[in-house]
Curated annotation (Swiss-Prot):
Top-level taxon of the source organism: Bacteria
GO cellular component, one term: cytoplasm
Family of the protein in this entry: Belongs to the universal ribosomal protein uS14 family.
PROSITE patterns per UniProt: RIBOSOMAL_S14 (PS00527)
Keyword Ribonucleoprotein listed: yes
NCBIfam families attached to this UniProt entry: PRK08881.1
The protein's assembly and partners: Part of the 30S ribosomal subunit. Contacts proteins S3 and S10.
Any one GO molecular function term: structural constituent of ribosome
Pfam families in the cross-refs: Ribosomal_S14
Listed name of the protein: Small ribosomal subunit protein uS14
Record's function text: Binds 16S rRNA, required for the assembly of 30S particles and may also be responsible for determining the conformation of the 16S rRNA at the A site.
GO biological process, one term: translation
Lineage: Bacteria, Pseudomonadati, Bacteroidota, Bacteroidia, Bacteroidales
InterPro entries named in the record: Ribosomal_uS14, Ribosomal_uS14_bac/plastid, Ribosomal_uS14_CS, Ribosomal_uS14_sf
Length: 89
């Protein structure tokens, strides 16, 4: 499980990206790269990293569900993920 500080840092970055998204698009369209460079580093969407919503785990993230593979397996076996069931053939 990720530290609470890591989860908080990612959340803070996501908020910063959302705050500057319109300004970033406008500056790119104008070609004003000096002003674009002056924006905060964490306002860049490239710096975001996908994390499990439950545990904060960064590896094994499954985008479709927004959780890690481990949590998906546990939740699917308990029947908490609609439409997902154990394969049998």
């Amino acid at each position: 499980m990720a530290k609470e500080s890591m989860k908080a840092r990612e959340l803070k970055r996501a908020r910063l990206v959302a705050k500057y998204v319109d300004k970033r698009v406008r500056l790119k369209k104008e070609g004003n790269y000096d002003s674009l460079q002056a924006l905060p580093k964490n306002a860049s969407p490239v710096r975001l990293h996908n994390r499990c919503r439950i545990t904060g785990r960064s590896k094994g993230y499954i985008r479709q569900f927004g959780i890690s593979r481990i949590q998906l397996r546990e939740m699917a076996s308990m029947g908490l993920v609609p439409g997902v069931r154990k394969a049998s053939w």
